């Protein structure tokens, strides 16, 4: 099975308000998604950016691990203070480019990418997961690994030929157990 490098694009040092508060939060959404893929047999690594200075810090990990997929999976938790900052979008764009430089398939899941998927696709992301992404991510990676068509996967945005394809959204999970 493929190997996945999970990360997120939140750098506390780039957010002066949160850096001043000195109350970092673990990237729970990223951890949940990574654990689901690991439980399903995938080789999973996590690169936590919270206390790092720059998106470039992921480059040595990309170089040594050579993951098949770079998954930038941002938390929905406290997203107004975290994921909707322009500087975090720019950090994600830089991470996308770094992933592409190392031949990764880049998958992004965030509230900002859901709202501005065209920008993320234009910057090189291969797939955007819209809404709750864990189940969509699992289905997408299994489908890609098996070289099956992705056109019927709910909750993804991707480039098909030269157009951006927006698939119908996946239903919100009702059973959380």
Please identify what each model-predicted range represents:
Residues 25, 176-177:
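Radical SAM [4Fe-4S] cluster-binding motif and immediate context
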Residues 1-2, 162:
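Sequence-level motif detector for i,i+2 pairs with an aromatic at +2
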Residues 19-24, 83-87:
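Short glycine-enriched, charge-decorated loop/helix-capping segments at active-site entrances
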Residues 29, 36, 40, 45-175:
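Glycine-rich beta-alpha loop elements in corrinoid/cobalamin-binding modules
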Residues 2-23:
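Short glycine-rich His-centered loop
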């Amino acid at each position: 099975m493929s190997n996945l490098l999970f990360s997120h694009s939140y750098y506390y040092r780039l957010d002066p308000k949160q850096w001043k508060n000195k109350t970092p939060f673990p990237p729970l959404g990223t951890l949940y998604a990574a654990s689901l893929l690991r439980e399903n047999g995938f080789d999973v690594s996590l690169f936590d950016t919270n206390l790092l200075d720059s998106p470039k810090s992921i480059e040595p990990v990309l170089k040594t691990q050579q993951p098949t997929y770079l998954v930038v999976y941002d938390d929905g938790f406290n997203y107004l203070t975290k994921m909707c900052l322009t500087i975090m979008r720019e950090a994600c764009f830089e991470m996308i480019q770094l992933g592409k430089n190392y031949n990764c398939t880049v998958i992004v899941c965030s509230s900002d990418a859901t709202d501005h998927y065209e920008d993320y696709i234009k910057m090189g992301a291969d797939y955007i997961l819209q809404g709750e992404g864990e189940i969509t991510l699992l289905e997408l990676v299994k489908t890609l690994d098996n070289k099956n068509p992705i056109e019927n996967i709910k909750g993804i945005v991707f480039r098909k030929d030269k157009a951006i394809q927006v698939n119908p959204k996946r239903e919100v999970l009702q059973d959380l157990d």
